[in-house]
Structure formats: structure tokens, C-alpha cells
Amino acid sequence: MPTLNLFNQAGEKISEVALNDAIFGITPNQQVLYDVVNAQRAALRQGTAKTKTRAEVRGGGKKPWRQKGTGRARQGSIRSPQWRGGGIVFGPIPRSYAVKVNQKVKQLALKSALSYHVLAENLVLVDNITVAEPKTKLFIEIMNNLKLDDRSIVLVDSVDKNLLLASNNLPGAVVREVSQVSVYELLKFKQVVLTQGAVKYYEEVLV
């Protein structure tokens, strides 16, 4: 059972917390992580690429020349694919790139991502994080107190507006509501910060 130090936002150690072994202490499943991250990245694609077929290109209703007697190859439309400005054959059409992922697989991927950060000693526990005003310097002060890397994601049980605004100016740091974070985001950041509320959420949802 992994045991981590619990800090306050001033960077002072409060106590030690024993985390649930079934969530934070499993052996990360690399194949599941690969599959789920690929699926989540695919779902982010807009899928709006579109080309026009010969039926959709403007013009081309009239036969360019008569069928026989000219010595040239027969043509039915100046918008046929072989013509300059003609329609595209088998071009992209709007589609969804989303891939179905089973709920149990998603949960295993979340557990694997969290356990990976525990093994890498990149998981930080904080009792709570709040800022009195929506100022970036207050959030930077908290990050410095906790000795956080520039590329860190902070997971809270509910996002405070001041905290969200205070972190928006930092390109490498992100504050997310724990219920909204993806496996891809968890793995993209070097350090993961969990509040006690976020840990409780995972223990309720993933067990």
C-alpha cells in the first residue's frame, strides 16, 4: 500500500496518507494506456475535412463536345475527376474518429496512470488549494511552496473560479476538476497534484 506525505499549500508536511492499493498501487498496464490514450486523442479530432465529388462541384452540366466525330476521347462533363477543376474521387468526408472504449478499460487506464505517477514519485498530495484573489503570483507561490515542476496538473474535487483564473496565465500548469480529467492529460504532465477531495473521488469511483 503506497504511503505519501500530505502537504498544505504552504508546503508544510501535515501527515502521511496510505493510498488505496487497488487504485494507486497496481502495475501500470502499458497496452491499456496506449489504447485509451489513442482513443482519447482520436476523439479530439474535428473530422471536418471535406472535398467535393463531381456531383458537388459547380458547373459541368453540359457535355463538352459531341460523343463521336471529333477524334478526341469521349467526355461527359468538364467536372469529371480527370479534368482540372473536376471532382475528387474517394476524398475525405466529415466523419467521427471516436473509438468506443469499455468502462472497465477506462478505469484500468486511470488506475495505471495514477500508479505510474506514484512509482515515478511524481504524485503530490495536498489537503486543499485555494487563492483569495484571481492573481497568477498567488498560484505561482503555491507551486513554489510545493516544489512543483512547470508542467504540472492540479486536480481538485470542485474548481474554484479564483484558482482557475489564477492558473490560466501559466502555459505549463493546469487546474482541472478531477471528474473531467482524461488519461491523456494525466500522462501528458510531469507531475500530478491531488487534493484530498480528489483522492476521495477516485476512491469512490474506481474501487
Swiss-Prot record:
KW RNA-binding (keyword) present: yes
Domain of life: Bacteria
MF GO annotations: rRNA binding; structural constituent of ribosome
Keywords: Ribonucleoprotein, Ribosomal protein, RNA-binding, rRNA-binding
Gene Ontology BP, a term: translation
Pfam families per record: Ribosomal_L4
Residues annotated as transmembrane: none
UniProt biased composition (Basic residues): 60-71
UniProt keyword annotation of Lipid metabolism present: no
SUPFAM superfamilies noted in UniProt: Ribosomal protein L4
A GO CC term assigned to this protein in UniProt: ribonucleoprotein complex
Chain intervals for the UniProt region annotation (Disordered): 47-78
Disulfide topology: none
Subunit structure: Part of the 50S ribosomal subunit.
Primary role: One of the primary rRNA binding proteins, this protein initially binds near the 5'-end of the 23S rRNA. It is important during the early stages of 50S assembly. It makes multiple contacts with different domains of the 23S rRNA in the assembled 50S subunit and ribosome. Forms part of the polypeptide exit tunnel.
Recorded family membership: Belongs to the universal ribosomal protein uL4 family.
Protein's UniProt name: Large ribosomal subunit protein uL4
Species name: Acholeplasma laidlawii (strain PG-8A)
Underlying gene: rplD
